[in-house]
Swiss-Prot record:
Glycans are attached at residues 94, 115. Belongs to the IL-7/IL-9 family. GO terms for molecular function: cytokine activity; growth factor activity; interleukin-7 receptor binding. This is Interleukin-7. It is found in: Secreted. The gene is Il7. It comes from Rattus norvegicus (Rat). The keyword Glycoprotein applies.
Length: 154
């Protein structure tokens, strides 16, 4: 009896509430049937992939972005949102107008489809803005994540 009173007097929540995982997400994917992805985003992702060339010159190390942000079962939309925001940095590479058009199409299209109501509008670090290897990897991860989402909804 004393133990129960002690817990509630000091505002300590029951252990079960502390151990419950946070499952709420502020992102909701709009187009799970894949029409917008297949007809718009995939085409632009493939074009960007061709424009960036081969990744044979890229080192095999994994950037911190991919260690911190994964496309796992509960965070696909959040990953895609962060990756789309990260893509905008590559506009500063100013490769060509066509490159920028495809980049904006993928970035804006992805953010529209994942429909995140994010409270955090942190400025993204610009350390990778001129790294074509990072861009290539980012595009590959975005493509893989979208494919994972679409396969799960079939």
């Amino acid at each position: 009896m004393f133990h129960v009173s002690f817990r509630y007097i000091f505002g300590i929540p029951p252990l079960i509430l502390v151990l419950l995982p946070v499952t709420s997400s502020d992102c909701h994917i709009k187009d799970k049937d894949g029409k917008a992805f297949g007809s718009v985003l995939m085409i632009s992702i493939n074009q960007l992939d061709k424009m960036t060339g081969t990744d044979s010159d890229c080192p095999n190390n994994e950037p911190n972005f991919f260690k911190k942000h994964l496309c796992d079962d509960t965070k696909e939309a959040a990953f895609l949102n962060r990756a789309a925001r990260k893509l905008r940095q590559f506009l500063k590479m100013n490769i060509s107008e066509e490159f920028n058009d495809h980049l904006l199409r993928v970035s804006d299209g992805t953010q529209t489809l994942v429909n995140c109501t994010s409270k955090e509008e942190k400025t993204i670090k610009e350390q990778k803005k001129n790294d074509p290897c990072f861009l290539k990897r980012l595009l590959r991860e975005i493509k893989t994540c979208w494919n994972k989402i679409l396969k799960g909804s079939i």
